[in-house]
């Protein structure tokens, strides 16, 4: 369990963030919630959610669940300077695991044109992943709640998204299954994975009607990661009001309108 010197700043940071999120939601969203009872009130849990909006997804879930959430975040969107420094400090205080998305070099090659830039980034990404895995396992074994977005990229993002349609969900990354398996490898920890669906409807220039739906925990065997990730993907898409297969679903919002 984290010591008081470590836990208190993280708790204070979370309370401040929740207050900011409530203000953002009041300005930008009408939120409805179903199934929040599926999230255990205590003990380790991973909430695996659809990623639609870069900001409001986390705010909707974080203000709904009456628990201190830790969020697995990607930091590669902040390439350096002040933004990266602020992000690094904030995630350390909040005890949020941080990764660098390995496919960033493919999606945004213009950022890696300098000689050796790709190799350096790949080394940094591997190091960040190992550190995030250690931190995640420690959090889960310590009884904490973790929010992850297995797609890796939101649909609405001011920096970059590889998505081209409103109803598109990217293939879920299997890392979430691996992290759960690592946490459970001690033979004592059991980590339920709660799927969370998000459905957005635009009701103004920058205002949304958001339906957040939690489902029953998905059984993660850890023995067949492909089957585990397929089951989780299908459940999150279903809760989001999309088809069972990626690429199906009713897209009511054009990405060109973002």
Question: Which residues are covered by each model-predicted region?
Answer:
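Helix-to-loop junction immediately C-terminal to a conserved catalytic motif
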Residues: 20-52
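N-terminal membrane-anchoring alpha-helices
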Residues: 1-26, 253-256
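Catalytic core of membrane glycerolipid acyltransferases/transacylases, capturing the structured
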Residues: 43-121
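Amphipathic alpha-helical segments that form well-ordered structural scaffolds
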Residues: 19-23, 60, 90, 135, ...
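Generic preference for hydrophobic
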Residues: 33, 47, 71-72, 193, ...
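Non-catalytic C-terminal accessory region of glycerolipid acyltransferases
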Residues: 114-258
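Short, flexible loop/turn elements at secondary-structure junctions
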Residues: 37, 51, 75-77, 197-200
